[in-house]
Amino acid sequence: MSSSFRVALAVALATLLLVLGGLWLFGEEDKRDLPESLCGTRVSPQILEPLLPAEGDVSERNDVDRDHPQPASPCRVYVGDEVALRLRFAWHSDAIDPLQVAKSIHSVSNLSMPERADLPDATVIGNDGAISTTSCKTEAGSQFTLSVLLEGVNPTRDTYRAPLKNLMRTYFPAVVETLGCR
């Protein structure tokens, strides 16, 4: 091997190591901190991550008062300055069919392409959100319904169905546990 070839090879290897080391080192810095709770209930950041835009600080505005529940209480999750998720905590006296709610054009929880989900509570998943409901007796009513609506997603694509189902599988029962149902 000629000395110029050895120098070129050494420079190439050193450059490769610097690039890979930089990616490893700075890749961790770029990873943002996701919340470990959502609207007052613990949630795994790994379950929340696929539902949020990839960049921006995550914050929330939570108007849910579990001690004095209102018929409907919103909680909004922001990424940067934009709303990414809208959650609606609703207490009511009559049982509802979440599929009818999801299909109604008059509903604030209207979903695109809703289908029933194979989960313990009555749940529907759409391309842009999910609705779960269960019996939960409190001073605000005997039923509780949680709607999760994604903002800014294409309602014709089913990209978020699996992540929404994962969220509702774990998050909805955890929310219900915090409500003091009798």
Residue ranges and their predicted role:
Residues 1, 12, 52, 56:
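Functional cleft and adjacent loop/helix regions within the main domain
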Residues 2-27:
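Hydrophobic membrane-insertion alpha-helices, especially the h-region
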